[in-house]
Regions:
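Intrinsically disordered, low-complexity acidic/polar segments
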Residues: 116, 205-207
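Active-site neighborhood of divalent metal-dependent phosphoester/pyrophosphate hydrolases
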Residues: 1-103, 162-171, 192-205
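Short, surface-exposed beta-strand/loop micro-motifs that present aromatic residues
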Residues: 183-189
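Cys-His-centered catalytic/binding microenvironment captured across papain-like cysteine peptidases
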Residues: 174-180
Length: 216
């Protein structure tokens, strides 16, 4: 048997629920399983594949339970569906634990060498909600009960191998679960046709319904 939890589960325990959803849907969908056994397929995800109604996952400073679930949902999606997709940047979601200090913009993680991560080709940094209901698709959990440092952050500078500077200071001093998003887009070619697989959620700003011409 398994004596210890895999690192992914230790860092992002909510991912187990997402994995179980994929297993459940496939076990119940006999026709779907038959299709996949016989037809090669490509997939791309929208918010419903991560947790319903994710918006603003790249909106700097945004705080919302669903928004900061992006990387957990994306990692699980690649485990079950996206693993076969051609991608421009194969680097996975980076998820780990780090220390933040109230009033400081620095995030310190002694287990990660940030100089070896392609930060310029990765997404925004999320500090996770860290509640048992973080990935539950139920409006009653859309409250403010998550970790006080749980926001969408822009990485402004790699200070050294184990330290990042973020765009805004932490609210409280604590060890947090954080992740840095991946680039999930790709393309492939068949004869003279080129097909583009888009990532419509991973790097999306929050739309402004009052200013529909706003860039971003």
């Amino acid at each position: 048997g398994q004596d210890t939890l895999p690192p992914t589960v230790k860092t992002m325990p909510s991912i187990v629920g997402v994995w179980e959803n994929y297993k459940l849907y496939l076990s119940r969908g006999n026709e779907l399983a038959q299709w996949h056994r016989n037809v090669p397929s490509y997939f791309t995800f929208d918010d419903h594949e991560l947790v319903n109604d994710i918006w603003g996952s790249a909106e700097i400073g945004k705080r919302h339970r669903r928004t900061v679930f992006r990387d957990i949902g994306t990692r699980a999606w690649f485990d079950y569906l996206g693993w076969a997709n051609p991608v421009e940047h194969p680097r996975r979601v980076h998820a780990a634990r780090g220390k933040m200090t109230a009033g400081s913009k620095l995030l310190v993680d002694s287990s990660t060498d940030f100089t070896k991560l392609p930060i310029d080709r990765m997404g925004t940094l999320h500090v996770h909600w860290d509640t048992p209901e973080a990935g539950v698709n139920n409006l009653k959990f859309d409250n403010d009960d998550g970790h006080k440092n749980s926001y969408v952050y822009q990485i402004t500078k790699v200070i050294d191998a184990h330290t990042l500077e973020l765009h805004m200071p932490a609210k409280v001093s604590d060890e947090v679960t954080y992740s840095i998003g991946r680039s999930s887009f790709g393309k492939f070619r068949v004869a003279n046709c080129e097909f583009f697989l888009l990532d419509t959620r991973g790097s999306r700003d929050l739309h402004d319904v009052a200013n529909r011409g706003k860039e971003g």
